[in-house]
Structures are given as structure tokens and as C-alpha cells.
Swiss-Prot record:
Pathway membership, UniProt: Protein modification; protein ubiquitination
Transmembrane segments annotated in the record for this chain: 218-238, 252-272
Location of the region described as Disordered in the Swiss-Prot/TrEMBL record: 60-79, 319-385, 401-421
Topology within the bilayer: Multi-pass membrane protein
One Pfam family here: RINGv
Zn finger region (RING-CH-type): 135-195
Protein name as it appears in the record: E3 ubiquitin-protein ligase MARCHF4
Residues forming coiled coils: none
Role summary: E3 ubiquitin-protein ligase. E3 ubiquitin ligases accept ubiquitin from an E2 ubiquitin-conjugating enzyme in the form of a thioester and then directly transfer the ubiquitin to targeted substrates.
Molecular function GO terms recorded: ubiquitin-protein transferase activity; zinc ion binding
Annotated positions binding Zn(2+) 1: 143, 146, 169, 172
Enzyme class, broadest EC rank: transferase
Predominant place of localization: Golgi
Species this protein is from: Danio rerio (Zebrafish)
Length: 421
């Protein structure tokens, strides 16, 4: 009995000693790892500061790491117990020669890649500069719409714009007009001089892109026009036809007449409101489905048109000026006329509330009216101030002219308020 109990206790002691040994071995291994890490951290050779560490190929690093790890594992197994090897220990096992050999020059592949990218950018810049500049160093004209040169087609200058926005290709301009729906330049507001050559074949007509609002505008204009035509035709027939005599006498039809008249007014207002938008859409469609010839900007013709419009304005304002200048029987301006002319001159100078005294002319002094078409002393002529001039002219006609006898006896003061627009 005692022998059996002793055997059991001895077996129990053996079984309990093995976990203790294992725990002691684990603790000992951890302490060794900690001390080895501290040794590597404190005693490892410093990295050279002359050149930055290079990126060695991954296959070489893996081979060296595997070799060092296998060597350390075999050494630990030879000592009788297994000790895990960390990466820092593997690095510590490498000698100083290995550290010096690991620091190599940077790979040339990165330099080649960066240099090739720089070369490609430089070549692209050179191509752009060659495309934009001629051999003489003068910048070649480019289309302001597609930014291409003369190799894409003939460049035109269709408006008053100058500089980099002067030239454009004819197809690009026609396409831009079809998108905007306007035949005028958006920068200088000059109307392009175009000639319609011919309309394309109906089989070649192209549809233009429309927004939802534009579709609604077209539908409203078309339906309003149809309703207006139908209602007006019915009203004309019912009011003039002898067979509709009984309709004109019926109260219900008279109410319908009033309703149709009101709806006709609404349709007319709708057509007037949506008409310009529909007209612009039609211009866009016409620009796409018709062949055009765009003309270059002619400065001489443009100046002639400006001169014609200026001459027309001056001819319209000349009779009014002569009426203001010649009011007396002997060509002498009256007091009201002279005061009005002085007020107009003050308004032209920027005076808001001019005050003039009508002084009678001295004996023997004569005044000659100046022609408004010729400016005096480099100042703009009187008809050019159209707003103030028209107001003063109306006031001069509304005011009664004074007799010549009364103007010599007393002086009257005329105060006028002129607002410049």
C-alpha cells in the first residue's frame, strides 16, 4: 500500500515538474531575447552618413535574411534549447563588412525613369512652342475655338477682335453660331458678315440639341399660333356669314365670343414673349443645315457704315437746331432761345441745375446761329446731347415768345432744371 502511494506521488512530481521547466524555459528565452535586443540597439555599428541607405533588391535581402536566420537557429539548437531569432539579431549577426557592402549607390533605374519623364515633358513643351511660334519668333495665329493652327484649315478674322482671339476657322465659327443662336460676336458685338450659299439636301438635315425649356417654348409658340388662327377664323366666319345670324343673337355664343377674344389676347402675348427664343432656335437650326461663306472683317466698310449712321443722325437733328437758332424776324435769337441754348451748353458740361440770365443783346450787336453739324473749339456739337437737347426744344415750343419791346425794358431770369441721362 505504501509502495503504491509512493509511486503515485513520484509520478505526480514528474508530471508537475515538466510544466515548471517549460515555464522557466519560456521566461529564460524571453529574457535572452530582451537582452539581445538591448545589445543590438546599443552596440550595433552606426550607419554611414555619407550616402543614404540604398534599396537593395528584395531577393538578395530575403537570401541574406534566410541565411542568417538558419545560422542562428542551428547555433541555438546546438546549445541544447531553441531560442527564437528576431530580425534585429539577424541584422546584428552581420559583420561590419556586410554593413558597408549593403550601402551601395542608388539604383540607376530610378534616375533613368525620372530623366525620361523630364525629357518627355521637355519634348512636349518644345512641340507646343514650335507649333505656336514660327522660325522668326512671331507667334502664329490660332483658332480661338479649337486652338488649332492653319494646318486644320484657313483662318479668318470675322470681327473687330484682335490679338489671340482674332482668328477662327470657318467650320468652328459656324458650329459656335449654331450652339449660341446669335450671328454677333460675344466680345465686340460685331455682326458677322456671312453669305448663304445654298441649303443642304433635306436628307442631310441635322437635328440640333434642345433643352427642356426650349422644347416647351417651341410647343407653346406653335400651339398658341394654331389656336389663334382657328379662333380668329371662327370669329370672322360667325360675324360675317349670313348662315351664322342665329349664333350672333344667342347669348351663349356672345359669351363664347368674349372668351375667345380674351384667349386670343393671351395667345398673342404668349407668341410675342416666346417669339425671340423660337427665332434664335431657328437661327441655330439654319446655321447647321445651310452652307455659309464667312467674310473677313473689312475695316474700311465698317468705318463707312459708322459715318453713314452718324450723318443720318445729324440730318435728323439739323432742322431742330435751325428752329432754335433762328426765332426772330431778322435772324436774332430770342431771349428764351438764348437761355435754352445756354442751359443746353451747361447741361453738356455736366451742370445739373444751371441758372441763366436773359440779357437783351446790345444795340448793333448781331448774333449768328452756329451750324450744329460743325463742332466748335473741339467740343461735341449740340445735337449730340440728344436727351437734354430734345427736352429743351420741347420746352422752347411750349413757352410763348416774348415781344421785343418788353425785353428791352426789363430783364427776366430763367431758371431751368436739366437732368442728364
Amino acid at each position: 500500500m505504501l509502495l503504491a502511494i509512493g509511486v503515485i506521488v513520484w509520478c505526480w512530481g514528474l508530471l508537475s515538474r515538466r510544466p515548471m521547466l517549460r515555464r522557466q524555459g519560456k521566461q529564460k528565452g524571453r529574457c535572452c531575447v530582451l537582452f539581445s535586443d538591448l545589445e543590438v540597439f546599443l552596440l550595433r555599428p552606426p550607419t554611414p552618413s555619407a550616402s543614404p541607405p540604398a534599396f537593395t533588391p528584395m531577393n538578395e535581402l530575403n537570401a541574406e535574411g534566410n541565411a542568417t536566420s538558419s545560422a542562428t537557429e542551428s547555433h541555438s539548437l546546438a546549445n541544447g534549447h531553441y531560442q527564437p531569432v528576431t530580425g534585429e539579431e539577424a541584422l546584428d549577426t552581420r559583420g561590419p563588412d556586410d554593413w558597408t557592402h549593403s550601402v551601395v549607390d542608388p539604383p540607376r533605374t530610378l534616375d533613368c525613369c525620372s530623366s525620361s519623364e523630364d525629357c518627355s515633358k521637355e519634348k512636349l513643351d518644345e512641340r507646343l512652342s514650335l507649333n505656336s511660334c514660327t522660325d522668326s519668333g512671331v507667334r502664329t495665329p490660332l483658332c480661338r475655338i479649337c486652338f488649332q493652327g492653319p494646318e486644320q484649315g484657313e483662318l479668318l478674322s470675322p470681327c473687330r477682335c484682335s490679338g489671340s482671339v482674332r482668328c477662327t476657322h470657318e467650320p468652328c465659327l459656324i458650329k459656335w453660331i449654331s450652339e449660341r443662336g446669335s450671328w454677333s460676336c460675344e466680345l465686340c458685338y460685331y455682326k458677322y458678315q456671312v453669305i448663304a450659299i445654298s441649303t443642304k439636301n433635306p436628307l442631310q438635315w441635322q437635328a440640333i440639341s434642345l433643352t427642356v425649356i426650349e422644347k416647351v417654348q417651341i410647343a407653346a409658340a406653335v400651339l398658341g399660333s394654331l389656336f389663334l388662327i382657328a379662333s380668329i377664323s371662327w370669329l370672322v366666319w360667325s360675324s360675317l356669314s349670313p348662315s351664322a345670324k342665329w349664333q350672333r343673337q344667342d347669348l351663349l355664343f356672345q359669351i363664347c365670343y368674349a372668351m375667345y377674344g380674351f384667349m386670343d389676347l393671351v395667345c398673342i402675348a404668349l407668341i410675342v414673349h416666346e417669339g425671340p427664343s423660337v427665332f434664335r432656335i431657328f437661327n441655330r437650326w439654319q446655321a447647321v443645315n445651310q452652307q455659309w461663306k464667312v467674310l473677313n472683317y473689312d475695316k474700311v466698310k465698317d468705318n463707312e457704315d459708322h459715318q453713314k449712321t452718324g450723318a443720318t443722325f445729324r440730318t435728323l437733328s439739323l432742322p431742330l437746331t435751325h428752329r432754335m437758332g433762328q426765332s426772330g424776324p431778322e435772324g436774332e435769337p430770342s431771349t428764351s432761345t438764348s437761355s435754352l441754348m445756354a442751359a443746353a451748353a451747361a447741361a453738356a458740361a455736366g451742370t445739373v441745375t444751371p441758372t441763366t440770365n436773359s440779357v437783351p443783346p446790345a444795340a448793333g450787336a448781331t448774333t449768328e446761329p452756329q451750324d450744329s453739324s460743325e463742332p466748335s473749339n473741339g467740343q461735341p456739337s449740340l445735337p449730340d446731347h440728344h436727351c437734354a437737347y430734345n427736352i429743351l426744344h420741347l420746352l422752347s415750343h411750349l413757352r410763348q415768345q416774348e415781344p421785343r419791346g418788353q425785353t428791352s425794358n426789363s430783364n427776366r431770369e430763367l431758371v431751368m432744371r436739366v437732368t442728364t441721362v
